[in-house]
């Protein structure tokens, strides 16, 4: 895989190349285009112009032999107690720095284009900086964080150098609503103020930011307030998705979930008013909770699949060091790739 100015990540496939565009978060497959043609070019501008000329080759005919992305739950601890957290009952013991870096290097050897670092709360991990240094310039990095830890604002220069996309979850700017869906274990913590302070620090260093919002029946009427706050902060990217089923919320999931039509209705209403100020997007749940298409690593460094309602499945003879063949044997790689792959018909 080659990296172009921390903006493009290009990987050879059996029948072409896949290009991951960091700024747009799009994966594009160019059929029968060879990576050696890209290697002849020197700058991002040259590569982008060349790919634009080859846009007729973009399709979904990829040989599904290698997953695009993996999500690493690098830290099991969290300072919040979100009512719908899917990771709560899957966290295991922390590992040593040596073991953490072994996992990071194995991820690189497997050729993933994008690695998501989450948890728990990843900024609690004492090894987060080491992992980012290991990945820097070799793959694309996302961090999924609640944004309430000061550590996030203290590492902005490294995040900028590695072009890390920081995805911060804000489910409400109303303290009462926030305490219902994302209660803080430290009752004295003003999480909104810390989030805003961290956003300002990230913006000062031009670190890419995206806000995530989990939409439920509890907070759906308060999305306009979030939009106003994001505009005031100068945030340009906002992604919404409905709450997913998790063991933690199984007893009240039906009460808090939205149908896709309900989610679309509130999304379009907010977009109508704020779409010219914020780049907004939404994800609609397809409800396939049995599919083995999401690849994860727990805080022990074990690779696994999570079909949510059917539990987890560890991969390979040694789940800490599975081979690509073992991953593909268990992962529905085709469904995994289709979930990310851009198609021309979408525009």
Model-derived segments and spans:
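Accessory C-terminal segments flanking Radical SAM cores
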Residues: 1-37, 246, 252-254, 275-347
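Radical SAM enzyme [4Fe-4S]-AdoMet core and its adjacent flexible, acidic
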Residues: 8, 176-292, 299, 308, ...
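Long, charge-rich, low-complexity alpha-helical segments
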Residues: 30-68
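Canonical Radical SAM [4Fe-4S] cluster-binding loop centered on the CxxxCxxC motif
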Residues: 62-99
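Exposed loop/turn and edge beta-strand positions of beta-sandwich/beta-sheet ligand-binding modules
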Residues: 68, 111, 291
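Residue-level recognition of short loop/turn positions
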Residues: 81, 146, 298-301
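Radical SAM/AdoMet-radical enzyme domain recognition
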Residues: 97-117, 125-240
């Amino acid at each position: 895989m080659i990296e172009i100015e921390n903006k493009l990540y290009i990987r050879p496939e059996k029948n072409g190349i896949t290009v991951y565009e960091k700024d747009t978060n799009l994966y594009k497959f160019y059929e029968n285009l060879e990576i050696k043609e890209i290697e002849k070019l020197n700058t991002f501008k040259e590569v982008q112009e060349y790919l634009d000329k080859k846009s007729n080759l973009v399709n979904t005919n990829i040989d599904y032999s290698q997953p695009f992305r993996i999500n690493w739950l690098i830290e099991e601890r969290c300072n919040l107690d979100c009512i719908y957290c899917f990771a709560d009952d899957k966290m295991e013991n922390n590992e040593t720095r040596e073991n953490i870096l072994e996992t990071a290097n194995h991820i690189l050897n497997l050729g993933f284009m994008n690695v998501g670092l989450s948890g728990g709360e990843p900024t609690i991990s004492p090894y987060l900086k080491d992992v980012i240094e290991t990945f820097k310039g070799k793959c694309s990095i996302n961090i999924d964080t609640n944004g309430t830890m000061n550590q996030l604002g203290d590492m902005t220069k490294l995040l900028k150098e590695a072009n890390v996309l920081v995805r911060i979850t804000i489910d409400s700017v109303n303290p009462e609503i926030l305490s219902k869906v994302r209660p803080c274990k430290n009752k004295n913590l003003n999480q909104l103020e810390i989030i805003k302070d961290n956003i300002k620090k990230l913006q000062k260093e031009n670190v890419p930011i995206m806000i995530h919002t989990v939409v439920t029946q509890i907070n759906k009427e308060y999305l306009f307030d979030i939009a106003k706050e994001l505009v005031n902060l100068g945030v340009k990217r906002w992604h919404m998705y409905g709450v997913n089923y998790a063991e933690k919320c199984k007893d009240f999931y039906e009460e808090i979930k939205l149908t896709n039509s309900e989610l679309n209705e509130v999304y379009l209403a907010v977009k109508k008013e704020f779409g010219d100020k914020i780049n907004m997007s939404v994800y609609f749940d397809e409800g396939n909770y049995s599919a083995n298409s999401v690849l994860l690593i727990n805080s022990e460094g074990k690779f696994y699949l999570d079909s949510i309602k059917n539990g987890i499945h560890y991969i390979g003879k040694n789940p800490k060091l599975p081979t690509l063949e073992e991953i593909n044997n268990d992962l529905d790689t085709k469904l995994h790739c289709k979930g990310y792959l851009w198609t021309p018909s979408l525009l």
